[in-house]
């Protein structure tokens, strides 16, 4: 309900289930935001409705979105367009129409309040390249959708992702003193890629510093 239809009541329930109280969950949110480098974000509630001091920026939401797409199974929920609940008695429809209309789009989330206007963090993946776009302050849902569509088109038309390292690819070893083994390997917990312009046809070299 949270991922598909922006259910504010469900967001509160999830917060209370995970942290005991809304306040405790908000403290976790702010701590995680700080860890991710979201320097201009302060959360005051778990549902996102307008509240004094509850604020963020497009850049900070992009940082959060970049992390979100790496969370296991999250995109399985955000890409749902329609979902039945309570044995078919209720049907929720995703406010992010791009997951239905835009090729490769599988998230992430829309939002709207009287202060923020119509906002969206949208992501799409094609041919191994994934991009995230964030828009805030649109005047209508259609403007939000159309502008996000054009931004994603621009990304796919002008940029490409080049994978540098695979997940768990060993890039070096270090000696271990008095350990269970003589050496330990270094490897990324997720694939590592760089974004290049499509006009850049030059050779890419990787240098690993341990």
Language model regions located:
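Domain-terminus/edge residues, biased toward the C-terminal soluble/receptor-binding domains
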Residues: 38, 50-210
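Active-site-adjacent loops and short helices of periplasmic peptidoglycan-processing enzymes
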Residues: 1-72
């Amino acid at each position: 309900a949270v991922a598909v239809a922006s259910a504010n009541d469900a967001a509160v329930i999830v917060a209370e289930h995970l942290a005991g109280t809304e306040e405790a969950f908000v403290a976790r949110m702010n701590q995680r935001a700080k860890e991710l480098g979201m320097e201009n974000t302060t959360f005051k509630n778990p549902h996102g409705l307008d509240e004094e001091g509850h604020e963020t920026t497009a850049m900070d939401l992009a940082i959060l979105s970049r992390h979100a797409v790496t969370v296991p199974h999250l995109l399985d929920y955000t890409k749902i367009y329609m979902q039945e609940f309570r044995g078919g008695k209720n049907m929720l429809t995703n406010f992010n129409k791009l997951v239905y209309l835009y090729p490769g789009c599988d998230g992430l989330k829309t939002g709207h309040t009287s202060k923020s206007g119509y906002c969206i963090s949208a992501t799409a993946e094609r041919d191994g390249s994934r991009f995230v776009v964030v828009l805030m302050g649109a005047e209508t849902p259609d403007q939000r959708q159309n502008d996000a569509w054009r931004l994603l088109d621009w990304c796919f038309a002008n940029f490409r992702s080049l994978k540098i390292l695979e997940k768990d690819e060993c890039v070096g070893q270090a000696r271990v003193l008095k350990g269970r083994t003589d050496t330990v390997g270094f490897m990324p917990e997720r694939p590592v890629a760089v974004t290049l312009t499509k006009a850049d046809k030059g050779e890419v070299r990787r240098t690993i510093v341990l």
